[in-house]
């Protein structure tokens, strides 16, 4: 959950900044805001650009936002075991060794991020290390390693790039239609840019349901990947451990892996992770 929200928040901030720059470029170049191939090309250029900037700085942002400490040299037995386990799983999954980090948090949590398989990070919270046994932590690490092996962050970036493109494009097309007939027929003026910004925020929130749907699907895949690496019983045990823990209510979601209990259909649209019950059931049905 943490890696997805961090990516989305960073991407939204960059998109808003890019939108301002884009509006200036449109005004200077004189591109018709009412719909042209040039407009779509510019939207794609800026839309994908913002998404890839988010991806490029994702590892740095994750370390900075969580205060994580990257393990360069293990300082105790726990860190040595953690580092060695990630190293073994990386070899088994066929990916380069990622950076390993630990950050202070009572919540049992873990995430993987990075711009590519060659520049990735796996981070775990102190709460996870304290609340789970070795087999369960091993399963969680394998889950995160599967995200790296599957290239989930790059795929997420491509999806976000497409969404950014159409959010920017349709925001300007609709804003032009709204302003048509007034003094801003060519999309100029502060009123037009205000409408564009508002529409981008609204469309961005609605379009995030697509990103969240993809995120839920990749969680099932990462669970399956963990089962392949360390065995499905260990992954099931890790999910059940989270299920027994205290539910965290941050934006209606749980910081680690998913949400305890069922949510409404509308709420589920904005969930980055499936409910724990569904994930456990999927693993139990897996042969």
Curated annotation (Swiss-Prot):
Membrane topology: Multi-pass membrane protein
Record key words, sorted: Cell inner membrane, Cell membrane, Hydrolase, Membrane, Metal-binding, Metalloprotease, Protease, Transmembrane, Transmembrane helix, Zinc
Main subcellular location of this protein, as a coarse class: membrane
Gene Ontology molecular function: metalloendopeptidase activity; zinc ion binding
EC number: 3.4.24.-
Transmembrane segments: 4-24, 37-57, 158-178, 194-214
Disulfide-bonded cysteines: none
Pfam families, A to Z: Peptidase_M48
Residue numbers annotated as active site: 144
GO biological process: proteolysis
CC annotations in GO: plasma membrane
Similarity remark: Belongs to the peptidase M48B family.
InterPro entries: HtpX_protease, Pept_M48_protease_HtpX, Peptidase_M48
Enzyme class: hydrolase
Organism field: Idiomarina loihiensis (strain ATCC BAA-735 / DSM 15497 / L2-TR)
Compartments where located: Cell inner membrane
Name of this protein: Protease HtpX
Binding site for Zn(2+): 143, 147, 219
């Amino acid at each position: 959950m943490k890696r997805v929200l961090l990516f989305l928040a960073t991407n939204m901030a960059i998109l808003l900044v890019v939108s301002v720059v884009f509006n200036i470029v449109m005004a200077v170049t004189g591109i018709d805001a009412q719909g042209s191939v040039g407009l779509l090309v510019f939207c794609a250029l800026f839309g994908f650009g913002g998404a890839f900037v988010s991806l490029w700085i994702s590892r740095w942002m994750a370390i900075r936002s969580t205060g994580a400490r990257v393990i360069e040299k293990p300082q105790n037995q726990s860190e040595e075991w953690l580092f060695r386990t990630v190293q073994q799983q990386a070899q088994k999954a066929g990916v380069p060794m990622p950076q390993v980090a630990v950050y202070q948090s009572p919540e049992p949590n873990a995430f993987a991020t990075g711009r590519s398989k060659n520049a990735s990070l796996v981070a775990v919270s102190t709460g996870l290390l304290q609340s789970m046994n070795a087999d369960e932590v091993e399963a969680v690490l394998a889950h995160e390693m599967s995200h790296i092996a599957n290239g989930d962050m790059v795929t997420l970036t491509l999806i976000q790039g497409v969404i950014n493109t159409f959010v920017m494009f349709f925001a300007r097309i609709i804003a032009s239609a709204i302003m048509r007939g007034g003094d801003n027929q060519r999309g100029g003026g502060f009123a037009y840019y205000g409408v564009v910004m508002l529409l981008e925020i609204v469309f961005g929130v609605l379009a995030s349901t697509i990103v969240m749907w993809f995120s839920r699907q990749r969680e099932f895949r990462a669970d399956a990947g963990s089962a392949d690496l360390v065995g499905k019983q260990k992954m099931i045990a890790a999910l059940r451990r989270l299920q027994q823990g205290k539910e965290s209510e941050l934006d209606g979601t749980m910081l680690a892996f998913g949400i305890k209990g069922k949510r409404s259909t509308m709420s589920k649209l904005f969930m980055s992770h499936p409910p724990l019950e569904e994930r456990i059931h999927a693993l139990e049905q897996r042969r």
